[in-house]
Swiss-Prot record:
Belongs to the GroES chaperonin family. One of its GO terms (biological process) is chaperone cofactor-dependent protein refolding. One of its GO terms (molecular function) is protein folding chaperone. InterPro entries: Chaperonin_GroES, Chaperonin_GroES_sf, Chaprnonin_Cpn10_CS, GroES-like_sf. Its main location: cytoplasm. Heptamer of 7 subunits arranged in a ring. Interacts with the chaperonin GroEL. It is found in: Cytoplasm. SMART domains: Cpn10 (SM00883). This is Co-chaperonin GroES. It comes from Lachnoclostridium phytofermentans (strain ATCC 700394 / DSM 18823 / ISDg). It comes from the Bacteria. Pfam families: Cpn10. Together with the chaperonin GroEL, plays an essential role in assisting protein folding. The GroEL-GroES system forms a nano-cage that allows encapsulation of the non-native substrate proteins and provides a physical environment optimized to promote and accelerate protein folding. GroES binds to the apical surface of the GroEL ring, thereby capping the opening of the GroEL channel.
Amino acid sequence: MKLVPLGDKVVLKQLVAEETTKSGIVLPGQAKEKPQQAEVVAVGPGGMVDGKEVTMQVKVGDKVIYSKYAGTEVKLDEEEFIVVKQNDIVAIVAD
């Protein structure tokens, strides 16, 4: 199965969060912050959203930064994804 987003929605796969701090302290599961960096795995078609034409600016494979509390978490075939509106993506990480 695969997720196919509608409208201006984007499916993200969260990148793994750091398990140790810069000073070498190992963080237990509850102490780790929710990562805000993810890879785009699917992009909706855009189109009319709330009466405005939306052009999708991200593409599959882009690494992005998204708003901390944005989106809906989804588990599919033992994999976890987050579905966000394109508007909740604040930046594309350029190499």
